[in-house]
């Protein structure tokens, strides 16, 4: 069986990295015993992808509700509200 060494993104240590359960999506979580930070390799934050802000604004202008927009895009309602609140500010 092949061994893959995983390094800590915070302190770059490779010898003190241990598995630390799974996320709600089923992805493996890791813990660094040196700096005590936890992380997962397959993490993606949907709300920060390019074009998300414009999609939220477009859906709001086309009459789609905030909760429906959140459900369709797979982000939280608070994310939708934050984007709409900040849409008046320059980006």
Curated annotation (Swiss-Prot):
Biological process terms in GO annotation: DNA transposition
InterPro entries, per database record: Homeodomain-like_sf, InsA_HTH_dom, InsA_N_dom_Znf, IS1_transposase_InsA
SUPFAM superfamilies: Homeodomain-like (SSF46689)
Superkingdom of origin: Bacteria
Keyword vocabulary terms for this entry: DNA recombination, Transposable element, Transposition
One Pfam short name: HTH_Tnp_IS1
Similarity comment text for this entry: Belongs to the IS1 elements InsA family.
Purpose of the protein: Absolutely required for transposition of IS1.
PANTHER family reported in the protein's UniProt record: INSERTION ELEMENT IS1 1 PROTEIN INSA-RELATED
Note: IS1-D is an iso-insertion sequence of IS1.
Protein name (record): Insertion element iso-IS1d protein InsA
Originating gene: insA
């Amino acid at each position: 069986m092949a061994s893959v060494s995983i390094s800590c993104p915070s302190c770059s240590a490779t010898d003190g990295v241990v598995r630390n359960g799974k996320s709600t999506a089923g992805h493996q979580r890791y813990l660094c015993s040196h700096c005590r930070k936890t992380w997962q390799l397959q993490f993606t934050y949907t709300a920060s992808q390019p074009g998300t802000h414009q999609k939220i604004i477009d859906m709001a202008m086309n009459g789609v509700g905030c909760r429906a927009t959140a459900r369709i895009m797979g982000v939280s309602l608070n994310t939708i509200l934050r984007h709409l609140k900040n849409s008046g500010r320059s980006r």
